[in-house]
């Protein structure tokens, strides 16, 4: 079926409530700087857009859940919609447990490309401050029911996952207002069943990690 689908560029939008769709990039006309913009998605009451990717139909979208599972979908399998449509609920597209929730998304190139999967990693962070780096190669064989991406300890959950080249700086931010920055290369690669290592020490029981970003070191300029 892949050979019958044009590998065109598309815009993937995902709402806070978990509605997803893809729309041809050609539907979005170029505007001058300072333009009013174009509507990219319709949303239900009290919902809003949270994620946006530009990809091609033959790429993969990886879903990571709060319980630490990973699911895959070819981009062309994402329901197609117009700029104003609301999309489909992710829960109806993948075999996710009813008490689990997708927390992070990664868009990747061809998972059959050995050079690509051997030169990239997935780095994850949990609410309680654990971080883990795993070679992308360990996620290169999609399964319909998903796989375990990280072992989540009791009272913890996955909050973010990022694709890296192994040459990034990682920043973790916590609710108490603190932030830690470290070199990705100092985090050794681990298997999918590992629970990771301590990335940041929380201030108290009420503190938690609220976000993680990764920046390629080639894009960092020190002042």
Locate each region found by the language model.
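Short, structured "edge-of-domain" segments at secondary-structure transitions
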Residues: 1-223
């Amino acid at each position: 079926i892949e050979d019958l689908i044009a590998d065109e560029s598309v815009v993937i939008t995902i709402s806070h409530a978990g509605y997803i769709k893809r729309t041809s990039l050609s539907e979005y006309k170029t505007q001058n700087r300072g333009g009013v913009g174009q509507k990219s998605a319709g949303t239900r009451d009290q919902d809003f857009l949270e994620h946006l990717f530009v990809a091609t139909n033959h790429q993969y979208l990886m879903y990571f859940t709060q319980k630490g599972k990973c699911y895959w979908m070819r981009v062309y399998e994402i329901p197609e919609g117009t700029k104003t449509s609301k999309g489909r609920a992710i829960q109806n597209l993948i075999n996710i447990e009813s008490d689990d929730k997708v927390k992070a998304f990664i868009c990747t190139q061809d998972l059959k490309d050995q050079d690509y999967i051997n030169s990239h990693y997935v780095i994850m962070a949990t609410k309680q401050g654990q971080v883990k780096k795993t070679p992308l190669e360990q996620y290169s064989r999609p399964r319909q029911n998903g796989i375990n991406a990280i072992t989540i300890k009791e009272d913890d959950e996955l909050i973010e996952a990022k694709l890296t080249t192994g040459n990034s700086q990682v920043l973790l931010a916590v609710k108490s207002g603190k932030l830690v920055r470290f070199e990705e290369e100092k985090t050794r690669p681990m298997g999918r069943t590992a629970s990771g290592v301590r990335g940041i020490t929380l201030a108290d029981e009420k503190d938690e990690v609220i976000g993680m970003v990764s920046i390629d070191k080639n894009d960092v300029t020190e002042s």
